[in-house]
UniProtKB/Swiss-Prot annotation:
Protein name per UniProt: RHO1 GDP-GTP exchange protein 2
Polar residues composition bias: residue spans: 109-125, 147-157, 204-221, 271-281, 303-325
One annotated GO biological process: small GTPase-mediated signal transduction
Compositionally biased residues, Basic residues: 329-338
Keywords: Acetylation, Guanine-nucleotide releasing factor, Phosphoprotein
Residues carrying Phosphoserine: 76, 193, 223, 566, 628
Species, as recorded: Saccharomyces cerevisiae (strain ATCC 204508 / S288c)
Length: 1356
């Protein structure tokens, strides 16, 4: 074959390889003369085109001839344009213009982003994929995408080397590459996700693509980020081109070793320079899935610098083998070619030389930019700086915890790494002191001032430069960590500016790493195998997809190991915020060659100013962005009064009058701006949200109703107010005054009160929609970036701050108003000022109440009860959260200040609540840790032990829960606090620990205040001691009753019957109150076990129950002279035997005595006969049955436990429920209707019904466990509550609107209608003695063992 044919065949093969990506196989059919086809007759032509013989050869030959002729014409012209510094001369001749187009075409440089059509959609299980994965060979460099779209010289060289040097044989699958210091190993890189800070800029570029990406062959499971196009795998064509380029690199190495004798002992290795024999390329196996412009790359590079100067200098002094990231054991691949080996040795030079990719490469849309030696995309993961070649050299590494900001004015180590916004934000939230601050007349709770914020940031980043701290704070403000309470401006270093956290969350869980943190994507495996290569001691998962901006694999591996150890050693404290990013002013340069004395190549290096100062260089201005500011369209109104009128109108006025006119004009101009903002809110926000689907249709109406509540009312009033001000302002250049206008419109400002009160809930709705509704979040962001320059929060907050501005504006006018000259206006302004003060007070009250109510509602949504539900009364509109904080079940060590307690407590105005946060399916649930403790039953003591409560409880009659001090004055170094729940059914004691002693003292003080407030609200219950130190444990009081019009008291005890006189006297402390006391009791009858007593004064009889026998005795016993025991024996009458207890009362117009008999499950009742009637009927005094009529007995199926009197019937409480007994019909039936399914809880046999009371047209049934309402048909009242007792009461008393339940340890006082516990009176062994309309008598045992009689006086 001739030389021409040889060249033609080579060009054909070259073209075929470039088009199809594989080597053309030899022809398997015989060739023929291409010119002879013209002689073929039409009769010999086949009917189908696919049947034409050798059609493919004919077409390819014609195409090849056209291309070859075009190339030969342009070959001489293109050769002159080749860069001699990049490619050797012997390779340039005749190989530079391998265009595959017959006509000269200008090809525009396009971004090297994979399109949807070029994405590799081959299934993972395809054999083709397996061949691609196994055919990958370790190479020194991989081509960047810039060479794919480069000039033809690279294509020519590529084709030549592909034809001259076939692919080497594949390595065995189990082959392990030997480690060698002198060879450069390249590990296939895993493509990390782009930094979050750069994603926003990338998405705005037209070249940003999120094409479908398949999983890597070595990893069958799909990565979480591959669905977003962050990870991609190369196509088969890319892998084939990598082998071609590998051979191309080896051929260049041979030529460099033979023809170039340059001694490379310098400190830098420059790719693409005149001294380098390597072509331009970056480290990439496949094409990038993202395209970056220069500004985005600059932002990424400047945002992820993480190395300090001191640590860099220290680590660079280490030996080569001391760095684990540059250790030869980390290089897992090397080349088999000795030529490549020697060439690399020649290039690298000495082992301590620093290597930097200093050349320019085409990135994105053809923009020239520097390629860093370290992957920019990895800067968020690590602080390790590596080189672009994995040669054995030192690699500096700086842990995050050891970083120090360059600009810090203090030499102390910062508390956290100041460049990471997330860590500083977490420390900021835990360090800032929240409190109440006032702005524009409104009080904001859980807020802080701008000066406080700057102080805390200065302390965190260890700097005295407040401007730097202010810039840092505004970075946190920009990411919505906190905001101005009125959304007017950014952070300011002022004690008068008030800010609050954006989340305003009261629920802070335990510290944990965010599941969405990109750091969690790092693998933690120690070794793995992939394909036919082994990766020992590596924490990296190999992947065929990579980024063209990645660094060497040693850096990646080292960074992963470093960050994995950092994650295992450092626990991020509780930080519920979305702040993320890098503060570049405090970050360190990522370049390993950047020192304090050498100018860094990067223009955005943080040390650049310092380096320029050291080198005496003049700083260059650099490129500047042309920022176009949106101008206000309304330029009609002048900013000041003097500019709005002519100079002749004000030049002769005194300065005080000018100042007054400026203040009046400010009222007018600010009111106009406020009305304009209301119009924008109405026309832009309300209308858009109402007419579009930004808010879902099911909640749209409710959202607009509450978020924009009272906007139209305010606009209606202020529009007329503005019109009045406008007319006054235009009536004369010099306004005489506006006091009358302000005073006239203040009564119409009432919608502001309702508007301010609706803001907490409106803010909650907005934040909820912003977090769950991406359309609403985008809408709000679009409004902020539009000409409005403010979001919905800013516009809605103006209505909150406007009433306070009125006060400030009126006050400013009064300062400049002469009381003598402008007397009328000054008086109007004074009246308006007083009216505005009252108005602001009502706004503060409404705002505070609304905020309290909103906080309680949020708390109600979070609470989850583990076992028994407890009614916390959170539906009460008056419920408030007094204090909250975090405690721990374990002691917090002094050294570990970042440990967060696991118990969240909430001190309400009625009880103390403990919650424990737990994350379930990414939702923070707050489970009740212990049963909530009502404040009247709460005892708190600083320390780990609770003193004995007997002397505290029995010391005074009105004892209730309180804060007590330990018995011994010992220190409390552990900051422990012990809580005791003084309940009957749920008594428990728990000890928790506070982080700080001040927090412990604050909690105890808040508990004291809450308990004192409860007692002050129930002053109508006067608990006084009437008798003590007489009845000891051998002579217990069983029952008492009053007689002689309440002046005498009969006391039944275990040893007999006593009588005492009741005396009253004025209280010295409160003259309008009187206190009662008993005289020394006198024994009337000496009989043992008198368990119950009753006096029937109208029948002049005393009823006694002695040893289960019911006796009657004349009332004259109390006036009998001499021994009362003998008088009782002579005049008493035995009525009934085997009586468990009895009761007397009026029923159906009769005075009945009812006795209960437990043994026979029955009751007996009879009517007591008047003694005078008995004497008239001739009954003798010795007749035993003279005082009673016929005895009626009613038998039940269970034991009777209580007796209650209704108007016409008896209600007997049996163990199986209440039974109604008809006196007239002598029959009984169940009170509760079993047809009511809502009463299943009250139909248990274990319940003990104790009392029934008529309340209106309903009946209150009291059991030992609970109480509830039923109607006269025995059905439960609809939507009625159930009162659950804290104790197990045996007796009840009612004093509307309160119900009193007597347990042996305390008395519960509750509201009948709501069941709310308002007061508890604590004592030991309490027994109810007597109830009346004025007072209740009960007795208890004091700490000395004496029975003490006390009175609950309702009238006082």
């Amino acid at each position: 074959m001739s030389e021409t044919n040889v060249d033609s065949l080579g060009d054909r093969n070259d073209i075929y390889s470039q088009i199809f990506g594989v080597e053309r196989r030899p022809d398997s059919f015989a060739t023929f003369d291409s010119d002879s086809h013209g002689d073929i007759s039409s009769q010999l032509l086949p009917n189908r085109i696919e049947n034409i013989q050798n059609l493919n050869v004919l077409l390819s030959e014609d195409i090849a001839n056209d291309i070859i002729i075009a190339k030969q014409r342009r070959r001489s012209g293109v050769e002159a344009a080749i860069d001699d510094s990049d490619i050797p001369n012997n390779e340039m001749k005749g190989k530079s213009s391998n265009y595959i187009l017959s006509q000269q075409t200008n090809i525009k440089e396009v971004p090297d982003t994979q399109s949807l059509s070029s994405a590799d959609n081959t299934p993972v299980s395809s054999p083709k994929k397996a061949r691609d994965a196994t055919s990958s060979h370790p190479i020194v460099h991989a081509k960047s995408m810039s060479h794919i779209y480069s000039t033809s010289n690279s294509a020519s060289r590529q084709a030549k080397h592909y034809n001259d040097h076939p692919l080497p044989p594949m390595s065995p699958r189990n082959e392990v590459y030997q480690k060698n210091k002198s060879t450069t190993a390249f590990v296939p890189k895993r493509k990390p996700s782009l930094p979050q800070l750069a994603l926003a800029g990338l998405k705005k570029q037209s070249s940003f693509s999120t094409g479908s990406a398949s999983t890597t062959p070595t990893q069958a499971r799909k990565s979480p980020l591959q669905g977003f196009g962050f990870f991609s795998r190369p196509s088969s064509k890319d892998l084939h081109e990598q082998h071609q380029h590998h051979q191309h690199i080896q051929h260049n190495n041979i030529n460099n070793h033979n023809n170039n004798n340059t001694n490379n002992n310098g400190a830098h290795y420059q790719v693409g320079s005149s001294n380098s024999n390597y072509p331009q390329h970056s480290h990439s196996i496949s094409s990038r899935s993202m395209s970056l412009n220069s500004s985005t790359l600059k932002n990424i590079a400047s945002s992820f610098q993480s190395k300090t100067s001191n640590s860099r200098k220290a680590t660079q002094k280490y030996d080569i083998t001391s760095n684990p990231f540059s250790d030869p054991h980390h290089h897992h691949h090397h080349h088999h070619s000795s030529n490549s080996h020697s060439s690399l040795n020649n290039v690298h030079g000495s082992g301590n030389s620093s290597s930097v990719m200093g050349s320019s490469s085409n990135i994105g849309l053809g923009l020239k930019t520097r390629v860093s030696s370290t992957s920019l995309a990895l800067k968020r993961y690590t602080s390790v700086s590596g080189t672009s070649l994995s040669s054995p050299r030192r690699s500096s590494m700086t842990p995050l915890s050891a970083s120090r900001p360059v600009m810090s004015a203090s030499s102390k180590k910062p508390q956290v790494y100041p460049a990471l916004l997330s860590r500083v934000a977490t420390k900021f939230k835990s360090s800032i002191q929240l409190g109440e601050h006032k702005k524009d007349g409104l009080v904001y709770r859980d807020a802080f001032t701008g000066q406080q914020a700057v102080d805390v940031i200065c302390a965190i980043i260890r700097t005295s430069d407040r401007n730097l701290a202010l810039l840092f704070g505004r970075s946190l403000d920009a990411q919505k960590l906190f905001h101005d309470v009125v959304y007017e401006h950014r952070l300011r270093d002022s004690p008068h500016e008030v800010y609050e956290f954006t989340d305003n969350s009261r629920f802070t869980g335990t510290g944990s790493t965010n599941a969405h943190d990109p750091l969690m994507l790092l693998p933690n495996s120690s070794s793995f195998n992939s394909g036919n290569h082994s990766y020992p001691n590596s924490g990296m998962v190999p992947s065929s997809s990579t980024s063209s901006l990645n660094s060497d694999q040693a850096t990646l591996t080292g960074s992963r190991l470093h960050m994995s150890s950092s994650l295992s050693q450092q626990k991020n404290p509780a930080a519920i915020h979305n702040v993320n990013g890098v503060f570049t002013l405090l970050a360190e340069c990522y370049s390993p060659t950047c020192t304090r004395d050498a100018l860094c190549y990067s223009i955005s290096c943080p040390r650049r100013l310092e380096q320029q100062a050291r080198l005496n260089l003049k700083p260059n201005g650099g490129l500047k962005r042309n920022i176009s500011m949106a101008l206000d369209d309304d330029d009609e109104e002048k900013p000041s009064w003097t500019s709005s009128v002519s100079k002749e109108d004000w030049e002769n006025l005194p300065k005080k009058e000018i100042k007054r006119q400026e203040a009046i004009y400010e009222v007018y101009i600010t009111e106009k701006n406020f009305v304009k903002s209301l119009e924008i809110t109405r026309d832009t926000f309300m209308k858009t949200l109402a007419e579009t689907n930004i808010i879902s249709a099911d909640i749209r109406k409710n959202f607009i109703k509450h978020v924009f509540a009272h906007i139209n009312d305010i606009y209606s009033v202020n529009r007329r107010f503005l019109k009045a001000l406008t007319d006054r302002q235009r009536s004369s250049p010099v306004v005489r005054g506006i006091g009358d206008i302000v005073l006239r419109f203040i009564p119409f400002f009432e919608p502001f009160v309702s508007y301010v009160a609706s803001r907490p809930y409106a803010k909650y709705l907005i934040e909820t929609q912003r977090s769950v509704n991406p359309y609403f979040a985008r809408f709000d962001d679009d409004m902020m970036s539009s000409s409005l320059r403010h979001g919905i929060d800013s516009f809605l907050s103006q209505g909150v701050s406007r009433p306070g501005r009125y006060m400030l504006l009126v006050k400013e006018i009064m300062k400049s108003t002469d009381p003598e000259k402008d007397k009328s206006d000054y008086e109007d302004l004074s009246k308006a000022m007083d009216a505005l003060r009252d108005f602001m007070k009502r706004i503060d009250q409404a705002s505070g109440a609304a905020q309290d109510r909103h906080d309680v509602k949020l708390l109600k949504q979070k609470i989850l009860f583990k076992n028994e539900y407890v009614n916390l009364g959170l539906n009460d509109e008056r419920r408030k959260i007094k204090h909250e904080g975090i405690l721990s079940r374990k002691e917090l060590s002094k050294s570990d200040g970042t440990v967060v307690g696991d118990i969240q407590f909430y001190l309400l105005d009625n009880m103390l609540l403990f919650l424990k946060a737990k994350a379930v399916n990414k939702w923070h649930q707050h489970k009740v840790f212990q049963r909530p403790i009502p404040l009247p039953l709460l005892f708190a003591c600083p320390g780990e032990d609770m003193p004995a409560l007997r002397k505290y409880i029995g010391d005074h009659p009105d004892c209730s829960g309180t804060v007590i001090q330990p018995e011994y004055n010992t220190s409390n170094p552990k900051n422990a606090i012990t809580f005791l729940y003084y309940g009957a059914k749920q008594r428990y004691q728990v000890t928790l620990y506070a982080a700080q002693y001040a927090g412990l003292q604050t909690l105890l003080e808040k508990i004291k205040q809450g308990q004192a407030a409860i007692i002050s609200k129930t002053e109508m219950f006067n608990v006084t001691k009437m008798s003590d130190r007489f009845f000891d444990y051998t002579n217990k009081i069983n029952s008492v009753t009053s007689c002689d019009g309440g002046r005498k008291l009969l006391i039944a005890t275990n040893s007999g019957l006593y009588m005492s006189n009741i005396k009253r006297q004025q209280n010295k402390d409160h003259r309008h109150k009187s206190s009662a006391f008993f005289s020394t009791p006198i024994q009337l009858v000496q009989r043992n076990n008198i368990t119950q007593i009753a006096v029937l004064e109208e029948f002049k009889s005393i009823i006694l129950l002695i040893d289960k026998k019911l006796y009657s005795c004349p009332l004259s016993l109390i006036e009998a002279e001499g021994n009362g025991t003998s008088f009782f024996k002579k005049h008493h009458k035995e009525l009934i035997n085997h009586v468990s207890f009895f009761a007397e009362g009026d029923c159906n117009g009769k005075r009945l005595i009812v006795t209960a008999h437990s043994s026979s499950h029955s009751i007996k009742y009879f009517e007591h006969e008047h003694p005078l009637l008995a004497e008239k009927n001739g009954s003798g005094s010795g007749n035993k049955k003279s005082l009673k009529k016929k005895i009626t007995e009613v038998i039940f199926d269970s034991e009777p436990v209580s007796i209650s009197f209704l108007k016409a019937n008896l209600c007997i409480g049996c163990k199986k429920g209440f039974q109604i007994v008809s006196i007239s019909q002598n029959a009984h039936e169940s009170l509760l209707d079993p047809a009511d399914t809502s009463l299943e809880f009250a139909l248990r046999d274990t319940l003990k019904p104790m009392a029934i009371y008529r309340v209106g047209n309903m009946f209150l049934l009291c059991y030992t466990e609970f109480a509830f309402f039923v109607n006269n048909q025995g059905w439960r009242k609809k939507e009625s509550h159930i009162i659950h007792w804290e104790g197990e009461p045996q007796k009840f008393a009612i004093w509307y609107p309160y119900i009193l339940a007597f347990d042996s340890n305390f008395i519960e006082i509750r509201k009948i209608e709501t069941g709310e516990l308002i007061r508890c009176v604590l004592a030991d062994k309490i027994r109810l003695l007597q109830t009346s309309t004025q007072e209740i008598l009960y007795c208890y045992e004091d700490y000395r063992g004496y029975d003490t009689v006390a009175s609950l006086d309702f009238w006082g």
